[in-house]
């Protein structure tokens, strides 16, 4: 059953490659002609472990096609996914221009029934706007062609997206017709055959599910960061607290790690949009407002520790920042805690050297010549007054601490992810962590 996916960004390309690997013929559509040409030339525009090989396999099997035209691919498919971006407006609400532009293009070009599935993260009620937009485009053409809309939100974690797609905790599908349900059941048959859960529900519930899931995870992170800050004040250890509460089966241990705040393309944007949606319906989410405020403050914790250590005497100090992406196994620096830290350091007059195993090209794009780009952790640490550990890449876990101790000016290690134990201390470093 051929399908089309419009919007070949992170979600769209991963979904397309995975569907193709399951035997589905996929037409990938994006208005960015340069991106489509790069894909045709075999270049992958995003970093995700295993994605290059998966895309190549799909192309070689003849199951992945690339186009810039919705009208060109519509005659070949019965299901068309919209996976375009929904960036936040100034007020935090999701910008639906791209989603509705896709809907309009479908309404202008469709000649036969199709199921229009929104995979983008969108506010509740978006499916009604998509339906109205397609109907309006048809009216302008003087036609009335049947179609259905559905919601199929993604739950992919950057760095583990292929595994998440192929072996999901669940697949959420929102439909409002038997035909739409039957088509989505056929599409996800390989998932069902492997005994993974496909949960059908109404469309509004599916749209809320995505926001609620990310908001819940963000809440756990901010809660543990609040606990960590209290632990520091009273002399407790947040790692011990995490073990104590995480062993409770009702709570579990996932997303209970304190640190220097969350970032990325999902949590900050989705929490803001969920807050905005709730306000529009007269149901303010005060818990999420606090979650957001806590996270904003937490991104300043590492700089505050550094400033206290030196009594505010920071001008001219050299520092190293390890980890620039918002999490390991990605080059995504959107809303990354590293950016807040680096900006604070530069404003204080510090000289900053940075290193990340993957995100250096993205860092150059964002930071320009304001920082020094190190070759590795050892190069970054030459004659510095502090090393900041911001992203928990495995490559940072076991460096030669004795070598680093001889390289630095001041043996200060500020660990924003609480991953180091006694090794740096035994080598002579002062270790500052969060909540312990």
Where in this protein do the model-derived segments appear?
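Structural/interface elements that position substrates and couple domains in central-metabolism enzymes
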Residues: 1-436
């Amino acid at each position: 059953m051929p399908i089309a996916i419009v919007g070949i960004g992170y979600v769209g390309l991963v979904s397309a490659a995975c569907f193709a690997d399951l035997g589905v013929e996929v037409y990938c559509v994006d208005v960015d002609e340069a991106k489509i040409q790069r894909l045709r030339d075999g270049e992958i525009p995003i970093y995700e472990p295993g994605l290059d090989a998966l895309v190549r396999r799909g192309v070689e099997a003849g199951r992945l096609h690339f186009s810039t035209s919705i009208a060109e691919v519509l005659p070949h498919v019965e299901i068309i996914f919209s996976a375009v971006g929904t960036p936040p407006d100034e007020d935090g609400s999701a910008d639906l221009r791209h989603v509705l532009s896709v809907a309009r293009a479908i309404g202008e070009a469709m000649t036969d029934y199709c199921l229009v599935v929104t995979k983008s993260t969108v506010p509740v009620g978006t499916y009604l706007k998509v339906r109205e937009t397609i109907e309006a485009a048809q009216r302008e053409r003087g036609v009335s062609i049947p179609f259905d809309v559905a919601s199929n939100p993604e739950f992919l974690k950057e760095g583990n997206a292929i595994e998440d797609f192929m072996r999901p905790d669940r697949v959420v599908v929102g439909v409002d017709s038997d035909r739409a349900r039957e088509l989505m059941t056929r599409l996800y048959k390989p998932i069902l055959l492997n005994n993974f859960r496909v949960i059908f529900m109404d469309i509004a519930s599916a749209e809320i599910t995505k926001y609620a899931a990310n908001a819940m995870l963000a809440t756990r992170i901010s809660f543990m960061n609040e606990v960590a800050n209290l632990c520091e004040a009273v002399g407790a250890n947040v790692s011990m607290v995490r073990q104590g509460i995480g062993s409770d089966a009702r709570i579990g241990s996932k997303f209970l790690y304190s640190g220097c705040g969350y970032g990325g393309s999902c949590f900050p944007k989705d929490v803001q949009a969920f807050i905005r949606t709730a306000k529009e319906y007269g149901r303010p989410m005060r818990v999420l407002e606090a979650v957001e405020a806590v996270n904003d403050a937490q991104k300043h914790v590492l700089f505050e520790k550094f400033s206290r250590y030196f009594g505010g005497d920071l001008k001219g100090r050299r520092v190293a920042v390890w980890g620039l992406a918002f999490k390991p196994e990605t080059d995504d620096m959107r809303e990354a805690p590293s950016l807040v830290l680096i900006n604070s350091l530069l404003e204080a007059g510090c000289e900053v050297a940075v290193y990340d195993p993957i995100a250096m090209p993205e860092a150059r794009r964002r930071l320009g010549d304001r920082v020094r780009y190190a070759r590795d952790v050892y190069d970054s640490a030459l004659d510095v007054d502090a090393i900041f550990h911001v992203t928990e890449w495995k490559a940072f876990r076991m460096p030669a601490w004795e070598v680093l101790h001889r390289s630095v000016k001041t043996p200060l290690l500020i660990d924003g992810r609480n991953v180091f134990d006694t090794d740096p201390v035994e080598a002579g470093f002062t270790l500052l962590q969060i909540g312990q």
